[in-house]
Design a protein with these regions (language model features):
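Beta-strand/loop nucleic-acid-binding surfaces
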Residues: 44-65
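Helix-rich effector regions associated with P-loop NTPase G domains
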Residues: 2-10, 15-19, 31, 38, ...
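Phosphate-binding glycine-rich loops and their immediate beta-loop-alpha structural context
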Residues: 109-157
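Short, acidic/hydrophobic/Gly-rich beta-strand patch recurrent on exposed beta strands
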Residues: 34-39, 50-52
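Short, charged beta-turn/beta-strand-edge "cap" motif at the junction between a beta-strand
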Residues: 76-80, 108-109
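Canonical P-loop GTPase G-domain recognition
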Residues: 141-195
Length: 318
């Protein structure tokens, strides 16, 4: 406990004197932090400072000392970070802070939309209490009818629990709607390699800063072009964060079995109607979740994923 109190104390420590300004950490390479002056709109080199973290702010072997997304105060002359402001939230994977939305991006063609990976991403976002949005890319490669079938399937299984934005970078479709929704926010763009994250960010920032890649014909998957998380400022108060692509994703780590139900928004209106307060919605009698599953108020895919998640998360703690 005293270690945590010491950490909180030194994380808010400030200095007198010096040429101090406030900024956001947009990149980290080894022991260097790249800080964007908060008063600057663009990511020009002269607005970014390569800084080290002041020694008294370091806790040995602690990756959370200072992470991408942190709001910091730094001495622009000495290039030293002297204060890290309190975070409103942070993600463990990738390690980021102060996020408003998790943008989950999947292609409607290749790589194939993986509903299991998508739902794992929703679980991880929900555990950190960060709202998620679904971005469907490459919609110009399918017909309007095929897109509608896709949207209907998402609606059928997830209802109104997640906003959906169909987009095409090539045809400039849906980008204005997406940009309007995320205006003034810090949004991660996460998804499998090859889904179009880099192309989307390049379009929004108006430069080909990020390398894009092609889909492997053999695996129908993309090759990783992003190896680290990076912040990009697309206007005065809107950030996109490019994150490394992936093909698999871990389940969140939960301590209590009852925590899992809270990560399924469609369960919320039925949980308190269960006969037993400790109902886990598996084999218990009088389970309102199972009753509403039979009525069609909860999708079979979502309930099966709940069981699958429960088995994987608590397999060693039954």
């Amino acid at each position: 406990m005293w270690v945590q109190k010491l950490k909180e104390l030194i994380m808010t420590e400030n200095n007198n004197g010096g040429n101090f300004i406030k900024g956001k950490i947009i990149r980290k390479i080894k022991g260097f932090y790249y800080v964007l002056d908060e008063n600057c709109i663009n990511l020009k080199e002269e607005n970014i400072y390569e800084c080290k973290l002041r020694g008294t702010l370091k806790i040995k072997n602690d990756k959370l000392n200072c992470i991408i997304g942190d709001i910091v105060e730094f001495d622009k002359d000495e290039k030293v970070i002297t204060k890290v402001e309190k975070r409103k939230n942070f993600l463990y994977r990738p390690l980021l802070s102060n996020i408003d939305f998790i943008g989950i991006l999947f292609s409607v063609v290749t790589p194939n939309f993986d509903f299991t990976v998508f739902q794992k991403m929703l679980l991880n976002a929900g555990q950190q209490d960060i709202p998620a949005i679904l971005i469907l890319s490459k919609i110009d490669l399918i017909s309007d009818e095929e897109l509608q079938i896709f949207l209907n399937e998402i609606k059928e299984n997830f209802g109104n629990t997640i906003p959906v934005f169909p987009v095409s970078v090539e045809k400039n479709i849906g980008l204005d709607n997406l940009l309007s929704y995320i205006k003034g926010k810090s949004v991660t763009v996460s998804g499998p390699s090859g889904a179009g994250k880099s192309s989307l960010i390049n379009t929004f920032i108006g430069e080909n800063i990020l390398e894009t890649n092609e889909i492997s014909e053999k695996t129908s998957r993309g090759r990783h072009t992003t190896t680290e998380s990076r912040f990009f400022k697309i206007d005065a108060d809107t950030y996109l964060i490019d994150t490394p692509g992936f093909s698999t994703l871990d389940f969140p780590k939960l301590k209590e079995k009852k925590e899992l139900e809270l990560l399924f928004p469609e369960f919320s209106e039925y949980i308190l109607q269960c006969k037993f307060r400790d109902c886990l919605h598996i084999n218990e009698p009088g389970c309102s979740i199972k009753e509403n599953l039979e009525k069609g108020n909860i999708s079979e895919m979502r309930y099966n994923f709940y069981l699958y998640s429960f088995e994987n998360i608590f397999s060693d703690n039954k």
